[in-house]
């Protein structure tokens, strides 16, 4: 039986350094070609903050966590599901990896409840 895939987080700050992205993709390519299976989840904090600034939407944080009103959530989804997701897929494909990018919203994959 195959082992379960390993989940790896690729942070938004790491994405701002092109050399780190290339090294990460190269390492992932080597591991996949050796038979490894992975799910990569990505961040995007700096990218979100940059778009919010361009849109003149003020970021609010409580205990280090971003508070997301409707306008902020729309911007977050644009950045994560659009810009960042596509960039990560493109990076990996450039290193010969077959991959796809999905959002937790796609097909109701993930649902959250506010407590």
Q: Residue locations for each model-derived region?
A:
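Nucleotide/pyrophosphate-binding catalytic subdomain
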Residues: 1-115
